[in-house]
Regions:
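Acidic, small-residue rich beta-repeat scaffolds with periodic aromatic anchors
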Residues: 30-92, 184-259, 322, 329-370
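A low-complexity, Ser/Thr/Gly/Pro-enriched, surface-exposed linker/loop concept
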Residues: 101-111, 282-312
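Repeat-based blade/solenoid architectures
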Residues: 103-125, 173-183, 201
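Beta-propeller blade repeat segments, especially FG-GAP/WD-type strand-to-loop junctions
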Residues: 85-88, 150-170, 206-211
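Bacterial N-terminal signal peptides
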Residues: 14-28
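N-terminal secretory signal peptides
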Residues: 56-57, 66, 252-299
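Structural signature of eukaryotic scaffold interfaces centered on beta-propeller domains
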Residues: 126-134, 183-186
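Acidic/hydrophobic-patterned starts of short beta strands in beta-sheet-rich repeat architectures
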Residues: 67, 133-144, 188-192
Length: 370
């Protein structure tokens, strides 16, 4: 009898212990499931111990609202936290923190501005609410600091769903690795990005949306680092999942570029231009077509050189087995152009229009560059 009572008591105690363990496990699961996802990096301890200001963001949605908790220091970039809430339930949905947020408020309401998106270098607000993947549900971009080009604004991107938001690594990558947030072309249903490196290297990319994700379609790189100052344009295109690349040199009008001589060939209208980019700088020859593509640029390689014979009024240069000659009169006006390939000469006619500049100006510039 005593043993039976002891067994029943032990059984009850074991059952109670089991329920306690189950309760603890259930509590842990609920807590984990309900944990607020936090994105971005910051000195949380320093932020917690510093004076802060709290702002409501401008009303941007019927379903959601947001706040900005930011350092009270009067700095351009300040530590802060953006929180997004469900309006109906009051539940916190997303938290983004950063050591470098910006405070831009509406002077009339005092609320933090939203949906300001002035590309490429203008103001961009801490929250942008727009349909990025063209599925009919608006998405969120929340500033997470100044991680894009030239210490510009960067964003964490959350795609809207029927039940809230989900973080998107692919869209976030586009909002981190370029100059600010991407632009949205709703009519073309495309996403466009831009980035640069100094004055002389620019890259623009266009993405289509497939299955809700961005897919690179075209990418154009303009590189002005060549000695002539003319940009090399490399265009990459997605051809059935494989990127193809074409490279060309592009003629651009530039106020710093001095045109020494310019004339057109007949009947194509192709422009022949001799130019330099400043006093004592090298002289370059460019053959430019109607689409401003440069078919021939000279010099490019080491050892290549333009030569002018004052006695015969001829400017010439050689590339490979081909020699090019521009023949002028005593006043420096071009009268003919010749292309000589392995001893065979082809005469190129000029359009019957006045040339701009002269061979004499080219000759003077060549002397100045020596």
């Amino acid at each position: 009898l005593h043993l039976s009572i002891v067994q029943r008591c032990a059984s009850r105690l074991g059952l109670q212990a089991l329920w306690v363990l189950v309760g603890l496990a259930s509590s842990t699961l609920v807590s984990a499931a309900g944990a607020l996802p936090t994105y971005g990096e910051m000195d949380a301890a320093g932020f917690a111990g510093s004076p802060r200001e709290n702002y409501a963001l401008q009303d941007f949605s019927d379903k959601y609202r947001a706040t900005l908790d930011i350092s009270a220091k009067d700095d351009v970039f300040r530590p802060g936290v953006i929180n997004v809430y469900d309006k109906a339930s009051g539940a916190a949905l997303i938290r983004v923190q950063s050591d470098e947020l910006v405070l831009g408020t509406d002077p009339k309401t005092g609320k933090v501005k939203t949906n300001v998106h002035e590309l490429p270098y203008g103001e961009q607000s801490v929250l942008i609410y727009q349909d990025f993947n063209f599925d009919g549900i608006k998405d969120l971009a929340l500033m997470d600091g100044q991680n894009s080009c030239y210490h510009g604004p960067s964003y964490q991107v959350f795609l809207g769903t029927a039940h809230g938001f989900r973080h998107s690594d692919s869209f976030t990558k586009l909002a981190q690795n370029n100059c600010g947030l991407f632009s949205v072309n709703e009519k073309a249903r495309k996403i466009e990005t831009m980035t640069k490196d100094g004055c002389c290297w620019h890259q623009t990319s266009t993405y289509s949306i497939r299955n809700g994700e961005p897919v690179l379609e075209t990418q154009t790189v303009l590189d002005h680092t060549g000695g002539s100052g003319l940009p090399t344009e490399t265009v990459s295109r997605n051809q059935n999942g494989k990127m193809t690349h074409t490279t060309s040199i592009v003629w651009e009008e530039d106020q710093q570029r001095e045109i020494l001589l310019s004339f057109r060939l007949a009947p194509s209208g192709k422009r022949i231009v001799l130019f330099r980019s400043g006093d004592a700088s090298p002289v370059f020859y460019a053959a430019v077509d109607s689409k401003n593509q440069v078919g021939l640029l000279f010099p490019q390689a080491d050892g290549e050189q333009l030569k002018y014979d004052a006695a015969s009024h001829v400017l010439s240069f050689v590339r490979g087995d081909t020699a090019y000659r521009i023949v002028g009169d005593a006043k420096g006006a071009p009268s003919a152009m010749q292309v000589v390939v392995r001893g065979k000469t082809t005469e190129l006619k000029l359009l019957a229009e006045p040339a701009k500049g002269s061979l004499n100006k080219v000759a003077d510039a060549l002397k100045a560059a020596q």
